[in-house]
Amino acid sequence: MESAARIIKPAFFRSFLVLALLVTVSVTSLNAQGNRRTVNQRPASPAAPADYRSKNFLIHTDLPAEEARDLLERLEKMLVIISTYWASPNRSVIECYVVKDLANWPAGSLHPAGMQSVEGGGGVTMSRTTYRGGQIIAAKSIVYATANKGTPQHEAVHAYCAQNFGRTGPVWYSEGMAEMGNNWKVVPRKGQPLAVTCERYVIDYIRQSEPKSLNEIVNSRDTTGDSWQNYCWRWALCHLLATNPNYSARFRPLGLALLTNKPVSFDQTYGSMDKEISFEYLFFLRHFDQGYRCDLCQWDWKTKFRKPNSVRPLSSKIEANQGWQASRVLVEEGQEYQISTFGEWNTATESKDVTASGDDSGRGTLMGVVLYENEAGDYELSEAFELGNADRFEAPASGKLFLRCRDNWHELADNSGKITVKIGE
């Protein structure tokens, strides 16, 4: 409900001295982030800041009433999602100053740190935490953000974490999860992992850049608010770990432990899976797009592979709506193998079923790739090769043969059907 507009006095912030101060800053960019550009500071029609309330938020903003209420709805929906993920209901109202035009705000009405971040086109979350006997007994956060879509949600994730856990975790987790919270559209449910819904500039930047290693992201001395580019890498890692079933079961407990200051680390949690995570992380960076689902593109590290023979060929069932799947076959470079296929699949809800040869455009064709370890012990892939309805093929490398239905990686979800593949010498 909208209340009467009021002038926000700076005296409140003079009393907002804290026992412990935690500051987390959102990404600031004047060029790459189209939805987080510098706030227009040119003269504008007067729009005195007003207060708008919902169950979990109090926002002071110069946005028009309709836009302010829409923002409240988006914030409340996001809060349901993140509180469900972390299994911790919000404890207290999150207060936000959301600025559309600085010209509408009287001098001194914004905290200097908040105003500085808003001037730069980003935002900041200031939190105070009160301890007693080493235990957190109270926490309060205030958000300052531009009204550009995305920044208030990002900062609200920081505020929620600070108020409910007393901290936001290390930078890679704090900023990566804040970007995830901003991008989440639906409550995560078992069996229905999240698809990629980030901004287009994130995809374009990552796909065109030299990847940052896991070590660079997790163990660097980067600080919050450093660059929008670093935020992209942190989001990518958190999205992979949170939505890929190979790693998600460990990721949520790790995050909760980081938020509650338990003696844990990324290396302790995933040390035994380092090679696999590094491989899937780089694979994700090369192939993701809007709609990409890590659960459908996860790699199978559990299936046992062995060499086939002419008497008993190895059989596998390859689903159309998944990425590379285990054939169970170990192949040797240069050797020929017999292959047969049975069944049909399709690559869209309304498309016709096709065999392993695919359609006229090549979609739906049975494809192969070989996974092997290089001299450094890291996983690598051969060039993908077409199998279709062939009755023989030559292995391009020695290793584990994986198969899939050819389709765009971010469009697998609407595929259906499966093909049985038998391979022998």
Predicted regions and their residues:
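Boundary at the C-terminal end of the N-terminal hydrophobic targeting segment
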Residues: 30-34
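Short alpha-helix carrying the canonical HExxH Zn2+-binding catalytic motif
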Residues: 144-157, 161
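Acidic/His/Gly-enriched intrinsically disordered linker/tail segments
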Residues: 36-45, 114-143, 147, 165-295
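Bacterial N-terminal signal peptides
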Residues: 14-26
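Zn2+-dependent metallopeptidase catalytic core
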Residues: 63-106, 153, 163
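Gly-Asp-aromatic-enriched flexible segments
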Residues: 287-425
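Bacterial N-terminal signal peptides that target proteins for export
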Residues: 1-17
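Acidic/histidine-rich, surface-exposed loop or edge segments in extracytoplasmic proteins
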Residues: 49-68, 136-138
